[in-house]
Amino acid sequence: IPAPEDCYVDGVIEQTDVLAKAIKVVMDEHRFNANNVAFSISSPRLATKEVLIPNVKANKIDKLVQANATEYFPVNMDEYIIQYTVLEKVEDQGQEKIKLMVAAVPSEVVESYYGLAKALGLKVAFVDYAGNSSYQIMKQQIGPEVSLVIQVENDGTVINIFKDNVLQLQRNVPYGKSMLVNAV
């Protein structure tokens, strides 16, 4: 569904009612009914970073990530939501560590999606970031060789490098299809 003009700015849904109406029209046209919605967010304001942490139990990872978030991202953590994905266990200087992909997204970005769900009369099942959603699909589809996966989106490009089915690098580049179209 193409977003109506100026509804979506840097990942924030600015005109919830206009976008909700456009989505409802398409849902009605296709007789699509739902109770839940899952969002996969793409925003130039979303930051990701690979992080190595000590090998701790799974239930301790979140507290460790939250406690060290300001070291990963130099922003006011009161305005951000921090999430992570476990990539793999690695050995670093003779010690077993856990490699994570940590994401920081402004709370206002996530809250705008909850507002859209409310306007649509839907319950949010989960919110993910586009890089992780793509990672979950790609890791099942590529082999053990080094693979470069490039996702060109409207406002940005996500570059993923895999080795042995493990994400080694993921970067968001703020150049996408819209820039190419405008250049032509």
Question: Where is each model-derived feature located?
Answer:
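Amphipathic alpha-helical regulatory segments at dimerization interfaces
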Residues: 25-29, 68-71, 116, 184
